[in-house]
C-alpha cells in the first residue's frame, strides 16, 4: 500500500531531477543552460510547439529586400518589364555567361572595344590579314617558304629590306569602267550579256561623245570541243546594244575571238577595230547540241537554228562589208584567221599598237584621287531619272 503511494511520486520527482540537473554548456543559440524548462514537464511539450520556437512563420519574415515590382500582384508586370530591358543576345544565357557581358572588365567588353569601323574595313583586312601572310603559327620567314605570293607582296624574292606595299589595291572593275573599258573574257552566257549591256547603257548615258572600248578574249558560244555552252541570242543582244549606243565602240581582240565573239569584233567602229599581234579569230556557224523529243519539237529547233544562222551571217556581212552569199560559202566549215588574215577579211582594221592615238591615256592617280573625294569614297549617286 505504502509502496503504491510512494512510487508515482518518486518517479515524478526523479524525472524532474533529471531534467533539472541535465545542464548543457552555454551557447549563443540557446537562452538558457538547461535542456528542458523547469516549469513544464518534458513529456507534456507538444512537438509542434517546440518546433515553433526554432523557426519563425512566413508572416513574420521581412520583404524589404525584395523590390516592390516583384511583390504580390506586381510580380508579373515586374518580370515582363525586366525581360524587355534585357538585350536579346542575353536570351538563353545562364548567370555566369551574363556576367561575362555585364562585368566592366570582361573579355567580351575588351574585345568589343577593339572592333571599330576601321578595324573591319576591307583595307585593314588586306593590309594586316592578307591571305597566307597571316598564317597562324608562322613568322614571316616560315611563311615565305610556303608561298611565292608572300614574296610578291613583299616586293620580290630577294633581300629583307623590301616590304609589302602599305596601300590597298584599287577597285579594278570600277577603274576599268571609269576608263570606259568593257571586257568580254568568257563564253557568252546570260550573266555576261547582262553585265555588258548594263555597262554599255551606263557609259552611253554618262558621256555619249566619248568612245567605249570593248576588249574581247572569248570562245563565243562553243567550247574547244565545239559543244554549245552559250546562247546565240545573248550575242545578238550585245550586238543590238552596240548599234543602239550613241557612243562609238572600239573593239580589240586581245586573245581570241571565236564565232559570235568574232562577229562582235567586226561590229566596232570602222577604222578602230584592232587585233593583238598573236591573237586568233575563228568563224563558225551556230549549232545546237544533240537532242531528242517529238517531231514538232525537233522541227522548232531546226527553224530556230536556221534563224540564228541567218542573223549571224547578216551581222557578219554588216561588219565585214562582204555579201551574205560569200560569207555563207566561207563558213560552211570553221574558218581560222590569224591577226593579219582577220584584217584582210574585213573583221579588223589594224594590229594594236601601244602608241596608237585612238586609245586615250588615263591618269589613274588622278582618277583615284577623284574617287576619294566623292561622298563615302564610292560612286556618285544615280541621277533622279534613273532612280
From Swiss-Prot:
For this protein, the record's SUPFAM superfamilies field holds: ClpP/crotonase
Keywords (A to Z) from UniProt: Chloroplast, Plastid, Transit peptide
Region: Disordered, residue numbers: 355-387
Give the GO terms filed under biological process for this record: chloroplast organization; proteolysis; RNA processing; rRNA processing
- Biased composition of type Basic and acidic residues is found at 355-365
Induction pattern: Repressed in darkness. Accumulates during leaf senescence.
Q: Tell me one GO molecular function of this protein.
A: ATP-dependent peptidase activity
Knockout-associated phenotype? Variegated leaf phenotype. Slow-growth phenotype, with chlorotic leaves during early development.
Read off the transit peptide span from the entry.
Answer: 1-41
Q: Where in the cell is it found?
A: Plastid, Chloroplast stroma
Entry GO CC: chloroplast; chloroplast envelope; chloroplast stroma; chloroplast thylakoid; chloroplastic endopeptidase Clp complex; nucleus; plastid stroma
Q: Does the keyword Chloroplast apply?
A: yes
> Pfam families this protein is in?
CLP_protease
**Family note:** Belongs to the peptidase S14 family.
Subunit structure, briefly? Component of the chloroplastic Clp protease core complex which consist of at least 16 proteins: CLPP4 (3 copies), CLPP5 (3 copies), CLPR4 (2 copies), ClpP1 (1 copy), CLPP6 (1 copy), CLPR2 (1 copy), CLPT1 (1 copy), CLPT2 (1 copy) and 3 copies of CLPP3 and/or CLPR1 and/or CLPR3. The core complex is organized in two heptameric rings, one containing CLPP3,4,5,6 in a 1:2:3:1 ratio and the other CLPP1 and CLPR1,2,3,4 in a 3:1:1:1:1 ratio.
Which function does this protein serve?
Answer: Required for chloroplast development and differentiation.
Matching PANTHER family, A to Z?
Answer: ATP-DEPENDENT CLP PROTEASE PROTEOLYTIC SUBUNIT (PTHR10381), ATP-DEPENDENT CLP PROTEASE PROTEOLYTIC SUBUNIT-RELATED PROTEIN 1, CHLOROPLASTIC (PTHR10381:SF55)
Can you name this protein? ATP-dependent Clp protease proteolytic subunit-related protein 1, chloroplastic
Q: Which organism is it from?
A: Arabidopsis thaliana (Mouse-ear cress)
Amino acid at each position: 500500500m505504502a509502496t503504491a503511494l510512494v512510487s508515482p511520486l518518486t518517479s515524478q520527482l526523479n524525472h524532474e531531477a533529471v531534467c533539472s540537473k541535465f545542464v548543457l554548456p552555454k551557447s549563443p543559440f540557446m537562452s538558457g543552460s538547461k535542456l528542458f524548462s523547469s516549469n513544464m514537464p518534458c513529456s507534456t511539450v507538444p512537438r509542434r510547439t517546440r518546433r515553433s520556437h526554432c523557426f519563425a512563420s512566413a508572416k513574420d519574415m521581412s520583404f524589404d529586400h525584395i523590390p516592390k515590382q516583384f511583390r504580390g500582384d506586381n510580380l508579373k508586370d515586374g518580370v515582363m518589364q525586366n525581360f524587355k530591358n534585357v538585350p536579346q543576345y542575353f536570351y538563353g544565357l545562364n548567370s555566369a555567361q551574363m556576367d561575362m557581358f555585364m562585368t566592366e572588365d570582361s573579355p567580351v567588353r575588351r574585345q568589343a572595344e577593339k572592333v571599330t569601323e576601321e578595324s573591319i574595313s576591307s583595307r585593314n583586312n588586306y593590309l594586316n590579314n592578307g591571305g597566307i601572310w597571316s598564317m597562324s603559327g608562322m613568322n614571316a620567314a616560315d611563311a615565305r617558304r610556303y608561298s611565292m605570293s608572300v614574296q610578291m607582296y613583299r616586293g620580290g624574292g630577294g633581300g629583307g629590306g623590301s616590304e609589302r606595299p602599305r596601300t590597298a589595291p584599287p577597285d579594278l572593275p570600277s577603274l576599268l569602267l571609269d576608263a570606259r573599258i568593257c571586257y568580254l573574257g568568257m563564253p557568252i552566257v546570260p550573266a555576261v550579256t547582262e553585265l555588258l549591256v548594263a555597262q554599255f547603257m551606263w557609259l552611253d548615258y554618262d558621256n555619249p561623245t566619248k568612245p567605249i572600248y570593248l576588249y574581247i578574249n572569248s570562245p563565243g558560244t562553243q567550247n574547244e570541243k565545239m559543244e554549245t555552252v552559250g546562247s546565240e541570242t545573248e550575242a545578238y543582244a550585245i550586238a543590238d546594244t552596240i548599234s543602239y549606243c550613241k557612243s562609238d565602240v572600239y573593239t580589240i581582240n586581245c586573245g581570241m575571238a571565236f564565232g559570235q565573239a568574232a562577229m562582235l569584233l567586226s561590229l566596232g567602229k570602222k577604222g578602230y577595230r584592232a587585233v593583238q599581234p598573236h591573237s586568233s579569230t575563228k568563224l563558225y556557224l551556230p549549232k545546237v547540241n544533240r537532242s531528242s523529243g517529238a517531231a514538232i519539237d525537233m522541227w522548232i529547233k531546226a527553224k530556230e537554228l536556221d534563224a540564228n544562222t541567218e542573223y549571224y551571217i547578216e551581222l557578219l556581212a554588216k561588219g565585214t562589208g562582204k555579201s551574205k552569199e560569200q560569207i555563207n560559202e566561207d563558213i560552211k566549215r570553221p574558218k581560222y584567221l590569224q591577226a593579219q588574215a582577220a584584217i584582210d577579211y574585213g573583221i579588223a582594221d589594224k594590229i594594236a599598237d601601244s602608241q596608237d592615238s585612238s586609245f586615250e591615256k588615263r591618269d589613274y592617280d588622278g582618277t583615284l584621287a577623284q574617287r576619294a573625294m566623292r561622298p563615302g569614297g564610292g560612286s556618285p549617286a544615280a541621277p533622279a531619272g534613273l532612280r
